[in-house]
Amino acid sequence: MKLLRYGPSGQEKPGILDADGRIRDLSAHVPDLAGDVLSDAALARLRAIDPATLPLVSGEPRIGACVGRVGKFIGIGLNYADHAAEAGMPVPKEPVVFGKWTSSICGPNDGIDIPKGSVKTDWEVELGVVIGTTCKDVDEARALDYVAGYCVVNDVSEREWQIERGGQWDKGKGFDTFGPIGPWLVTRDEVPDPQRVDLWLEIDGHRYQNGNTRTMVFTVAQLVAYLSTCMTLQPGDVITTGTPPGVGMGIKPSPVFLKAGQTVRLGIDGLGEQLQSTRNAQ
């Protein structure tokens, strides 16, 4: 299934794409795509519904983040060896974990606010993993059983705040609008191997990132298992799993960063696309 949330910010309703790619309303069946609605049992109940029997959503509504009430938004750094190289950092022996504030979450097409004074706002297309079942100390072999599905994430990053100003990466990762998620939550049965998906990103039509999750340092299963040893993962938690090479700070001889008035387009095969305009934060 391709699940989504549509409507004004803060008033999103749950929906599903039908066979023709049209949005059907799910709000008579579930209040939101959040919490226990993401469990295997609840998703099985949604799967049993014929989308053609659901109300058709008219027009072109705003698409919100594909998960509601996210409890934890967990980032993984340097998870592609070639990205670590372009960043001038060693390939990690254990996952690099940081937090993205949930206040950074926005819809896939809502736009990116460049922070006041920023000249180093950067892009990162990433595979997002949405937890569906509470898990703690799970084995790698069973880790994917706890995943509800997958989505596109743009891990927007302000490199000066992330790298140059001391402290933790979190500072440069959590600005408002730095966490576009969606458009769809694609259930895990439709992504048989999360280590075999292509991901890409363009700025103003120029392709900067082309990658495949097969080159991850740590697989999705390894990340879920690892994280579950140091925290309890809960339904609706989102893990954004790292980016392939081609980010702005890695461009030689001179880095390239986002400016107001640009268009960012990114996507992952089978998971949909995002389209964002950049603007200066007010």
UniProtKB/Swiss-Prot annotation:
Its cofactor is Mg(2+). Its EC number is 3.-.-.-. The keyword Hydrolase applies. Keywords: Hydrolase, Magnesium, Metal-binding. One of its GO terms (molecular function) is ureidoglycolate lyase activity. Signal peptide: none annotated. Mg(2+) binds at E124, E126, D155. One of its GO terms (biological process) is urate catabolic process. It is an enzyme of class 3 (hydrolase). InterPro entries: FAH (IPR051121), Fumarylacetoacetase-like_C (IPR011234), Fumarylacetoacetase_C_sf (IPR036663). Pfam families: FAA_hydrolase. Belongs to the FAH family. This is Putative hydrolase BamMC406_5393.
